[in-house]
Swiss-Prot record:
This is Carbohydrate deacetylase 2. It comes from Listeria innocua serovar 6a (strain ATCC BAA-680 / CLIP 11262). HAMAP family: COD. Probably catalyzes the deacetylation of acetylated carbohydrates an important step in the degradation of oligosaccharides. The lineage of its organism: Bacteria, Bacillati, Bacillota, Bacilli, Bacillales. GO terms for molecular function: deacetylase activity; hydrolase activity, acting on carbon-nitrogen (but not peptide) bonds, in linear amides; metal ion binding.
């Protein structure tokens, strides 16, 4: 089978960036998605240019930090993007404002990276949770000809998306990637699979702005561990990125 191991949150912080690069250079990570609105975005761009074998997509962000556009329905009274804990799936986002924000993020990606992203996905599953956001993201994906990876739109129809929830693992049962070994049969039965990860080193910004902190360091250790490499070799797993996937 062919496996994409993708890291979300490239550009979140310098510590996260270094962790993602180490997970690729020292381990089995093949792909990442870049957040263009976060403080360490340009640092991530610089690192990526020294790491041409790492596939890089765009991590559409509607839930953290400041937007690139002025959409009134996207922000709180402080001008910050609205965090999911203050919304519901029916939150009244304006679809055109969401589309324009995502389009601006795409253009910032291409301006700095000098290429198109390998694929689109979203921070905190916003393109899965909010129907209006899903519609705006699909519109952008169709316009630029780059598939959106989410649970329903099947932008990459060949790829099964794996993490704890689809495998029906109780939240918090694992704080590393050992669920891969424990659920190998449910993962290895497909031809193409993406495993979502969040590797990284920790810093103050992450500890103050992310509910997912210590497990990032644990996932990094898993990705660079001899055990993971041995597991993939023993099961004849071919590591690929989204550049290697047939498009619809």
């Amino acid at each position: 089978m062919k496996l994409i191991i993708n890291a979300d949150d490239f550009g979140f912080t310098r510590a996260i960036n270094y962790g993602i690069i180490d997970a690729h250079n020292l381990g089995v990570l093949t792909s990442t998605t870049l957040m263009v609105t976060m403080p360490a975005f340009e640092h991530a761009v610089d690192l990526s240019k020294k790491t041409p074998t790492l596939g890089i997509g765009l991590h559409l962000n509607l839930t953290l930090g400041k937007p690139l556009t002025n959409g009134a329905t996207l922000v709180n009274e402080d001008g910050e993007l609205i965090k999911p804990k203050f919304t519901t799936p029916e939150y009244p986002y304006n679809e055109e404002e969401v589309y324009q924000e995502f389009k601006a993020q795409y253009h910032r990606f291409t301006e700095f990276m000098k290429k198109k992203p390998s694929h689109l996905d979203s921070h905190l599953f916003s393109t899965d949770i909010y129907p209006v956001v899903t519609s705006a993201a699909k519109r952008l994906a169709e316009e630029i000809g780059i598939p959106l990876r989410n649970h329903d739109t099947k932008g990459f129809e060949h790829v099964e998306f794996m993490w704890e929830k689809p495998l029906e693992i109780p939240y918090g049962e694992y704080d590393n990637l050992d669920y891969i070994y424990d659920n190998a049969a449910s993962i290895l039965c497909y031809d193409y699979v993406e495993i979502m990860t969040h590797p990284g080193y920790l810093d103050t910004f992450i500890l103050e702005n992310s509910t997912f902190s210590t497990p990032r360091a644990n996932e990094l250790e898993s990705l660079i561990s001899p055990r993971m490499r041995q597991f993939l070799n023993e099961n004849n797993v071919e590591l690929i990125s989204y550049h290697d996937i047939p498009k619809k």
